[in-house]
Amino acid sequence: MKVGVLTGGGDCPGLNAVIRAVVRKGVQEYGYDFTGFRDGWRGPLEGDTVPLDIPAVRGILPRGGTVLGSSRTNPLKQRDGIRRIKDNLAALGVEALITIGGEDTLGVATRLADEYGVPCVGVPKTIDNDLSATDYTFGFDTAVGIATEAIDRLHTTAESHMRVLVVEVMGRHAGWIALHSGLAGGANVILIPEQRFDVEQVCSWVTSRFRASYAPIVVVAEGAMPRDGDMVLKDESLDSYGHVRLSGVGEWLAKQIEKRTGNEARTTVLGHVQRGGTPSAFDRWLATRFGLHAVDCVHDGDFGKMVALRGTDIVRVPIAEATARLKTVDPALYEEVGVFFG
């Protein structure tokens, strides 16, 4: 049996661990042949492939990024995109497809399976940790570790100059990275997309820290919005899935704090550094388990499913169900950590 593998959407630490596990188990236990598709959905759209065998995945476990490349190519925006993918898979002799990605990549896989009957298995990937069907996605733990280390380092420079430091982290619709890293890093204010924030309240918290001779750290998710206003954007261009490229709320907030409190404020936007570099031990562990179970899905003929973490178990859920809604921060959880604000 020949199985195709692709990685779509934004890269994140742990992708190579999935690929390695898929190939190792698929070859050694089931005797499968593997074909890698380059750059997400562009690969099957254009028939751009790379051989995947055990030598090809040797040594990639600790590497960040993806050896297959990735992109935000959207076949649904291409003329006859889904049909072209089906035809190319048939021409290459690919009998099943393992798609590793977030809601957009997996959404295309759902269409491919539903409309053309292409056997697909999904593996969830997003550093935002916002897919509802799984407790955690790989890449999230690494991103939180990177953000926490940055916050730790920024405390010392904030104290040296007695200024406010606003740290902008990733999180379009969900504030998991902001909440976890902010709490772990001892931030004095944490702002998330799920809860619109009051700028005056933020300034009050900041001022209270200065009264205690302490330089405050404000952690804000890129998708956070002020109570009276809209999302702050530097760039209003869209990607191929219609998503705005976020960034700008941190800089805007720092200016508001400086203007309203009279205290000097600076912004650090962590950006893509959260997605890069060596995956954490947990992300390697989780990604490897996802890869092993994805191959089992193929072997069992259990298509249209996505592997997911529930407690310590890897389970199978319908891809359509997994992408139907986002997993966001519960208001009660956000209120729980509010004791540390100000």
Curated annotation (Swiss-Prot):
Keyword Kinase: yes
Site (Important for catalytic activity and substrate specificity): D104
Keyword Metal-binding: yes
Pathway annotation: Carbohydrate degradation; glycolysis; D-glyceraldehyde 3-phosphate and glycerone phosphate from D-glucose: step 3/4
Keywords from the named record: Cytoplasm, Glycolysis, Kinase, Magnesium, Metal-binding, Transferase
Cofactor needs: Mg(2+)
Catalytically driven reaction(s): beta-D-fructose 6-phosphate + diphosphate = beta-D-fructose 1,6-bisphosphate + phosphate + H(+)
Disruption phenotype: No effect.
Locations listed in the record: Cytoplasm
GO molecular function: 6-phosphofructokinase activity; ATP binding; diphosphate-fructose-6-phosphate 1-phosphotransferase activity; fructose-6-phosphate binding; metal ion binding
Membrane-spanning segments: none
GO biological process: canonical glycolysis; fructose 1,6-bisphosphate metabolic process; fructose 6-phosphate metabolic process
Active-site annotation: D128
Site residues, Important for catalytic activity: K125
One CC-aspect GO term: 6-phosphofructokinase complex
Binding positions for Mg(2+) per the UniProt entry: E103
Enzyme class: transferase
InterPro entries for this protein: ATP_PFK, ATP_PFK_prok-type, Phosphofructokinase_CS, Phosphofructokinase_dom, Phosphofructokinase_III, PKF_sf
Regulation: Non-allosteric.
Family annotation (SUPFAM superfamilies): Phosphofructokinase (SSF53784)
Its biological purpose: Catalyzes the phosphorylation of D-fructose 6-phosphate, the first committing step of glycolysis. Uses inorganic phosphate (PPi) as phosphoryl donor instead of ATP like common ATP-dependent phosphofructokinases (ATP-PFKs), which renders the reaction reversible, and can thus function both in glycolysis and gluconeogenesis. Consistently, PPi-PFK can replace the enzymes of both the forward (ATP-PFK) and reverse (fructose-bisphosphatase (FBPase)) reactions.
The protein's name in its UniProt record: Pyrophosphate--fructose 6-phosphate 1-phosphotransferase
Organism: Streptomyces coelicolor (strain ATCC BAA-471 / A3(2) / M145)
Gene (name only): pfkA1
